[in-house]
Each structure stands twice: as C-alpha cells, then as structure tokens.
Regions:
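Polytopic transmembrane helical bundles with strong interfacial aromatic enrichment
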Residues: 2-247
C-alpha cells in the first residue's frame, strides 16, 4: 500500500498502536545494544588518553549522552503531554507517562556520572554549580510529574494535571543548556557545537556520538515497552485487552 494512502490517524488509538509498538521494540533494542557496544569499544580502547584529565575523562562517553537524553526526553514528554492536554489524546498522555521514568533515569545517570567525574576534576563530589543545580531541578520535575500522576485516581484528570507541570517545567531545559554561557560556572562548555570545530580528538567525538545514538535507541525501546504496559493497565477493562492477556 502506498504510504500516502495509509491512515496514520488510526494509530492514535491505543488498540492500534499496541501491536505496532511491540514490533518496533526489538529493532530499537538491537540497535541500542550494537551502538552502545561500539561506543564502549571506541571510548575505552580506541580513544586516546586526555592530556589534562588522563583516563578519568572516559566517563564522558556515558555522562554526556545521558545529560543530552535527560533534556531530550523531557522535551518529548512535555510535548506529548501537551498534545494529550490540547487534543484530549489518550495515547499521547500515555506516551508522556511512559517517557517519565526513562527521563528520570537518564537525569540520575547524568548526575551520578557527573559526581564521579567531578571528584578527580574539581576535588568534590558535588558543587552548587548552575548547570548541576538546574539538572537536579530536572530530576525533581520528573519525580514530581510521576508523583502527581500517581496521586490522582482519575487517569484523565491525572493526565491534565501532570501535563501542566511538565509544560511549566520546560523553562528549565534552556536554563540547563545555556547555564555555562549565562553564568560563571565550574562546568565546562558544550562538548559539541554546530558553530565551531570540535576541540576533542576525532575518535573521542565519534565514540561519544555513537554512544549517544545507543542511548537514543535505548530510550525509545524503553519508552515503547513501558507504553505497552501502560496501555494494558489503562485499557484493562476493554474487550481487546482481555483477548490479549488471555492468549
């Protein structure tokens, strides 16, 4: 069937999207495994030792992708929460709910690896730096989104309330990104920039970008897996879910 003739709106229904998500998950999971495997190899065995930080810098191959994904996932979560709020789309709200735990995990991973990197670099596990503090606020926003959603029994009212919180929290994302430019911070500037040539070795940059692709694939696979679970939970009283779980 030509792509132009496919009725894409049919996949806005949880019942229609559920099997599609199931078919996509293995492909994203395999891609995540391959990209992360190659990224780890490049980061640990191919990339040279940094002249200033020695071997300690290698945590960048986890820290930077996790930090990037913490912001990307939040923007995606807020976007789908907003779509669900404006258009009353159940699947969009479910997707926002499914993205939240993955985003929280990415944020925690960024903070944890940042602490491990900061100890040999700054001499402290934590400093109240503008970027670190705003990243911590991002973690609290994820936790607040999940907690608020879980605290309200009515799913539709929970979707609306959590969506408002997610949309308000979007203002924190540019603060995280531009904090090193707006304030005098300990945190280094952007590792990759579109306006200037990279300051790191090519193998370092390649390893970090490959790991980032792996993290992208992982986040998509994890969100789709959790979305399927959310669909089954929210639609458990429907006939089609009863047929699925009885197989």
């Amino acid at each position: 069937m030509p792509v132009s003739r496919i009725n894409w709106f049919q996949y806005a229904a949880p019942q229609s999207f559920y099997p599609v998500a199931g078919r996509m998950i293995p492909w994203f999971a395999i891609a995540a495994t391959l990209f992360c495997g190659v990224g780890v190899y490049l980061g640990l065995w191919v990339a040279p030792t940094d002249a200033q930080q020695g071997e300690a810098y290698r945590i960048i191959f986890v820290h930077v992708p996790a930090a990037w994904m913490s912001m990307v996932v939040y923007l995606a979560m807020a976007f789908w929460a907003g779509v669900g709020l404006v258009f009353n789309s159940r699947l969009s709200s479910m997707l926002a709910t499914a993205l939240a735990p993955t985003g929280a995990w990415m944020t925690f991973l960024a903070l944890w690896t940042g602490a491990l990197w900061g100890k040999p670099t700054w001499g402290a596990w934590w400093v109240w730096d503008a970027r670190l503090t705003s990243e911590l606020v991002l973690l609290f926003l994820y936790i607040g989104f999940m907690s608020l959603h879980a605290a309200i029994d009515d799913p539709r009212r929970a979707d609306r309330s959590a969506a408002l919180l997610a949309l308000v929290g979007v203002v924190n994302v540019p603060i995280i990104y531009f904090s090193v430019k707006w304030w005098n911070t300990l945190h280094q500037g952007a590792s990759v920039s579109l306006t200037r040539s990279p300051s790191m070795a090519t193998t370092m940059l390649l390893g970090m970008l490959v790991m980032t692709l792996g993290f992208w694939m992982y986040c998509i696979a994890a969100a789709l897996f959790r979305l399927r679970t959310t669909i089954l939970e929210r639609e458990r009283h429907t006939a089609w879910v009863q047929r699925v779980v009885s197989v």
